[in-house]
């Protein structure tokens, strides 16, 4: 699909596989007429320079999909997942996003383990109870995020800007940060870092 417009579309429970969307619009600029993807499956799909702002992505599966330079502001993505089950005991996770704006979006309870986000904007978003284990949020804007009960073990945060990750309330075991980010984490501990 190239330069297509999907307004007021109900794609709930729809299935797409290896589908490409280039410069497509799924809502109006004021976030009205947003498309519904609730419970849909988009497996190994590519969205490039698309606008999904205001769309409902709740409980949808995006395994192996890729977002490139998309606008996805204020999306409702509670229960969003990048993980498909190969069998009863074997999950497989994959999702990538580059230079995509997810600001003001709600990813509560999302399963984003092993997802790779690079240079994305999540500012003022909600990642409460989201599973980000072994994921990467490199060079992302993570300012003013709600992290309550999020799983962050082994998360790669190198180059990201954040101000609400509290090491007293979140398990940061094996989280990867750069030396310049130590000060961002130490603020919640009352430490003053001085570089000589």
Set out the residue ranges of the language-model regions.
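Tandem repeat scaffolds
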Residues: 1-196
């Amino acid at each position: 699909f190239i330069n297509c417009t999907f307004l007021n579309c109900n794609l709930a429970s729809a299935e797409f596989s290896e589908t490409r969307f280039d410069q497509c619009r799924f809502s109006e600029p004021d976030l009205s007429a947003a498309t519904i993807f609730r419970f849909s499956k988009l497996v190994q799909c590519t969205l490039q320079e698309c606008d999904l702002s205001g769309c409902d992505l709740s409980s949808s599966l995006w395994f192996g999909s890729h977002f490139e330079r998309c606008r996805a502001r204020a999306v409702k993505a509670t229960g969003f997942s990048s993980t498909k089950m190969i069998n009863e005991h074997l999950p497989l996770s994959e999702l990538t996003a580059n230079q995509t704006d997810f600001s003001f979006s709600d990813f509560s309870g999302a399963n984003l383990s092993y997802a790779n986000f690079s240079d994305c904007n999540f500012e003022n978003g909600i990642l409460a109870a989201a599973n980000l284990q072994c994921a990467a949020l490199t060079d992302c804007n993570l300012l003013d995020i709600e992290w309550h009960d999020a799983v962050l073990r082994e998360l790669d945060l190198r180059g990201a800007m954040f101000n609400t990750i509290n090491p007293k309330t979140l398990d940061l075991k094996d989280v990867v940060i750069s030396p310049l980010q130590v000060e961002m984490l130490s603020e919640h501990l009352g430490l003053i870092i001085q570089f000589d």
